[in-house]
């Protein structure tokens, strides 16, 4: 026979926590282990979210079940640890964050693999990336010095794809980042890259010192939703031309380039930035086909109205005539502005529609034409 406590906890799986309760009920709820985050605890089985009081599953402060377990483990809250495991939380996430031997032993008793700390850390990191569990990953790794120190330095940077991310992660850093900051910005970047709204809002609230880095990352990755939110709802502003320079550095970044253009960036300056980048990289034998991403940005800037025949650009082209992209730009009249891009729209959903229409009507035909003109 189940005790009242166990039955109550099981019932709460099906029913969200009540928001109306008498002050005298608080003590009873606390004794039953049903009080969490300043309110009666509840669990939405469909969303796998732990709530408190009148909190809804979509609230920024609501917790995914595994995150709730990690929080309880960090605070050595024995009753809550048992409750969250009863509801289906992965206890291996808990043992990683256990700060005391007693809590670690409890995690093992509840089913955690004692070998997980030795053999499971890398696989877990990769799984969290694949599942895009940004907030859970930050809860596990951020400020978890013992776990971060357990990673070999070389393996650590390889693990988070150092070569691919080093530019944007190191942006705004005056000194070499410690692992803790690197982990935070790595997962924050994933949230921005895949437009994970709840993680972005949660991290923005918790780490306001990263506001300008967040906007720069959104521009670099072409996340127009986050650019719009930061720029117009939070009044986080940067010079449009500086933003455009970042947008141009990311391959095939039509969304980012267009948005910076609409915000007031000089499109001729953007083209000069791209040509300068190509000029810098030309010795690496970049070709039209192997550097499609950067060429796509050049082509798009011209479609927005950039003039490839300015004196400054032509002087650069003369020095690098051997490059295929440069040869294309020499063909006067081959590339021209696209009529659909004359509209200046700031609403993210409408921006995506414009770019989608542009790509459908321009890209495939245009590149076929360009190929024919190279013969």
UniProtKB/Swiss-Prot annotation:
Q: Which InterPro entries match?
A: ASFV_MGF360
Sorted alphabetically, the Gene Ontology BP terms of this entry are: taxis
Family per similarity comment: Belongs to the asfivirus MGF 360 family.
Q: What does this protein do?
A: Plays a role in virus cell tropism, and may be required for efficient virus replication in macrophages.
By what name is this protein known? Protein MGF 360-5L
């Amino acid at each position: 026979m189940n005790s009242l406590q166990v039955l109550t906890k099981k019932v709460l799986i099906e029913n969200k926590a009540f928001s109306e309760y008498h002050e005298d009920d608080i003590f009873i709820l606390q004794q039953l282990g049903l009080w969490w985050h300043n309110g009666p605890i509840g669990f939405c089985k469909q969303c796998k979210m732990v709530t408190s009081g009148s909190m809804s599953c979509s609230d920024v402060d609501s917790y995914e079940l595994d995150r709730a377990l990690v929080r309880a483990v960090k605070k050595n809250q024995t009753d809550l640890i048992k409750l969250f495991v009863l509801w289906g939380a992965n206890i291996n996430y808990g043992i990683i964050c256990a700060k005391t031997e007693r809590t670690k032993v409890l995690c093992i008793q509840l089913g955690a693999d004692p070998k997980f700390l030795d053999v499971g850390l890398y696989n877990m990191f990769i799984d969290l990336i694949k599942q895009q569990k940004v907030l859970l990953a930050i809860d596990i790794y951020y400020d978890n010095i013992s776990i971060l120190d357990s990673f070999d330095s070389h393996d650590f940077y390889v693990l988070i794809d150092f070569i691919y991310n080093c530019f944007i992660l190191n942006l705004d850093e005056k000194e070499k980042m410690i692992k803790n900051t690197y982990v935070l910005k790595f997962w924050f970047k994933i949230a921005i890259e895949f437009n994970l709204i709840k993680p972005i809002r949660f991290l923005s609230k918790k780490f306001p010192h990263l506001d300008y880095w967040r906007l720069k990352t959104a521009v670099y990755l072409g996340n127009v939703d986050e650019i719009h939110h930061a720029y117009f709802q939070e009044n986080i502003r940067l010079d449009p031309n500086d933003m455009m320079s970042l947008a141009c550095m990311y391959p095939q970044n039509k969304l980012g380039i267009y948005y910076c253009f609409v915000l007031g960036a000089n499109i001729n300056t953007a083209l000069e930035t791209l040509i300068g980048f190509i000029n810098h990289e030309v010795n690496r034998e970049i070709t039209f086909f192997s550097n499609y991403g950067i060429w796509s940005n050049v082509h798009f800037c011209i479609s927005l109205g950039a003039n490839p025949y300015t004196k400054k650009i032509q002087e650069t082209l003369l020095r690098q005539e051997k490059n295929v992209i440069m040869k294309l730009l020499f063909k006067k009249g081959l590339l021209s502005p696209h009529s659909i891009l004359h509209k200046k729209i700031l609403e993210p959903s409408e921006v995506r529609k414009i770019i989608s229409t542009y790509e459908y009507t321009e890209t495939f035909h245009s590149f076929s034409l360009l190929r024919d003109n190279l013969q």
